[in-house]
């Protein structure tokens, strides 16, 4: 029998992307609740319990409700794309390249929390340095990022695309999360292994999909004052053999005049760059990804495949 997959929230931005991806698969059976019955709690519970894997593409509170509907029904495994369970100790963090053994943890887990798009890039940069002892856990990390506007869901998409929308946004780029209380910070701190709460400054650009995440560091404040080559070597070793995360060669990065946030739009990969100058003792770590790819639906499908042993 084919594994049954239920996408709870398949009409949202991430849910639609996952549904489209799975439509091409003949090794799965995707079960869908009739659109008119989406708010029927009892019927939703039936679909959740009928699934081998339920992928939750819902706001935090709705995801928590969906999980509660499965209490006492442990045969359904869950992938939650919301922020609700990303720092919960009972949930496996769904970043397969996070550390040695993480793929196996995801594959064996019943509960998997899909990472946020911004933390995916930031954690990909800082976690290997922390694990290698280069980045002190109390380093005052700052993360700057720009995302395509689809990351804000249907409401922001409408505000950016519909000129007749009452709250139309004409800006080509805008900062948000100005009080430094973005909901992604807790998972960034926990899974990045940072003792000090990082400063996170997100922004949105006038492009649908794509993302750049930057983490600037002072080499002199890292353990042993490493060279750019050493920092690059740590990242390269950490992601050796990974087919989704690519560490761009140092000499190739040095020749780049720019990095395009949309380069990986529509793709599931992630590129990591090491830029900087040893003359001034500064390095800028950069992650490039699709906010809806490795940053959302692509990661969810990757986690689903791991859970199915594929």
From Swiss-Prot:
A single GO molecular-function term is: NAD binding
Give me the reactions it catalyses.
Answer: N-acetyl-L-glutamate 5-semialdehyde + phosphate + NADP(+) = N-acetyl-L-glutamyl 5-phosphate + NADPH + H(+)
Note the InterPro entries from the entry.
Answer: AGPR_AS (IPR023013), AGPR_type-2 (IPR010136), NAD(P)-bd_dom_sf (IPR036291), NAGSA_dehydrogenase (IPR050085), Semialdehyde_DH_NAD-bd (IPR000534)
Q: Known SMART domains for this protein?
A: Semialdhyde_dh
Cellular compartments annotated: Cytoplasm
Which CDD domains does UniProt cross-reference here? AGPR_2_C, AGPR_2_N
Q: Which Pfam families match?
A: Semialdhyde_dh, Semialdhyde_dhC_1
Principal place of residence: cytoplasm
Cellular component terms per the entry's GO annotation: cytoplasm
Which residue windows are transmembrane per the record?
A: none
The record places the active site at 117
Pathway linked to the protein: Amino-acid biosynthesis; L-arginine biosynthesis; N(2)-acetyl-L-ornithine from L-glutamate: step 3/4
GO biological processes:
L-arginine biosynthetic process
Alphabetically sorted, this entry's keywords are: Amino-acid biosynthesis, Arginine biosynthesis, Cytoplasm, NADP, Oxidoreductase
Source superkingdom: Bacteria
Q: Does the keyword Oxidoreductase apply?
A: yes
What EC designation does it have?
Answer: 1.2.1.38
Regarding protein family, the annotation reads:
Belongs to the NAGSA dehydrogenase family. Type 2 subfamily.
Role according to the record: Catalyzes the NADPH-dependent reduction of N-acetyl-5-glutamyl phosphate to yield N-acetyl-L-glutamate 5-semialdehyde.
Any idea what this protein is called?
N-acetyl-gamma-glutamyl-phosphate reductase
